[in-house]
Amino acid sequence: MMQFKNVLAAAALALGVSVPAVAQTAEDDGLDYKPYPHMFVGVQGGAQTTFTNYDNLKLITPTASVSFGAFFTPVVGARLHFNGWQNKGGFKDATQDFKYDYKYATSDLDLMLNLSTLFGKKNYYPLNVYLIGGIGLNYACDNDDAYANKNLMPLAYKNDRLSHNARVGAMLDWNLMKNLSLNLEVNANSLGDRYNSKTNGK
C-alpha cells in the first residue's frame, strides 16, 4: 500500500459550462422538458496548484478540461473527464531554489452524486451541488527542466511518465436555461511522487 508521504496532492478550481441534451416531455416541476435522464458535454477553464513543501502560490498554472457524461437518475450520474495543460514544480534545499515546467493530461471516470436532489424533496432544482469522485490515469511530458537537474532530483524522468490519478471534488451547477448551465468546480487529485519528479520532502 502506498504511504501518504509518497502521494502527491494537486488541487484545481475551474469555471465551466455544460450543455445537456434533454427530452421534450413535460414534467410536474413546471418545465416544458424532462430533466432526467440526460446526457451532457462540459468545458471548463481554471487554475491549479500542486501541494508540496514548496510555496503553492508560486506553482499556480492554468488548466482546461472537457467532459462527456450522463445523469441516469435525478441523483446519480457519471462522466468521462479529460484535463490538462501546464504544470509547475519547485525544488528547494539549503543551497538550491528553482522552479521547472512540464505538461500533463489526465483522464478520469467520475461518479457524480447530486446532493440537492438526494436530500431535497424534488427531482429538479435550478441550483445543484454535486459530489464527485473518480479514478484515472495521468500522463506527464516535456520534463526537460527537471531532468536537467537530475543530480538533485533522482526521480526526474527524461521523456514521459504515466501515473494513477484519484480524485474527489465538489461542483456547484446553475441551470441557466434548458440546454445551458454554468458551474464552479473544485477538486483534489492524488498522484505518485514521480509525477513532479521529487518526493514531498523537497
Segments from the language model and where they lie:
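Short loop/turn motifs that connect adjacent beta-strands in outer-membrane beta-barrel proteins
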Residues: T25-H38, V75, T117-V129, L176-N179
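Gram-negative (and chloroplast) outer-membrane scaffold detector with strong preference
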Residues: V76-N149, R161
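Cleavable N-terminal export/targeting peptides
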Residues: M1-Y33
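Residues on the lipid-exposed face of transmembrane beta-strands in outer-membrane beta-barrel proteins
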Residues: V43, A47, V66-A70, L109-L115, ...
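Residues that define the transmembrane beta-barrel architecture of outer-membrane proteins
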Residues: P37, K58-A64, D101-S107, L127, ...
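Outer-membrane beta-barrel translocator domains and adjoining extracellular loop/strand segments
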Residues: N53-I60, G89-F98, C141-M153, R194-G201
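Predominantly the C-terminal beta-signal and adjacent terminal strand-loop region
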Residues: G89-D93, Y102-Y104, M177-K202
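Short glycine/proline- and aromatic-enriched beta-strand/turn motifs that initiate or cap beta-hairpins
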Residues: A23-G69, D142
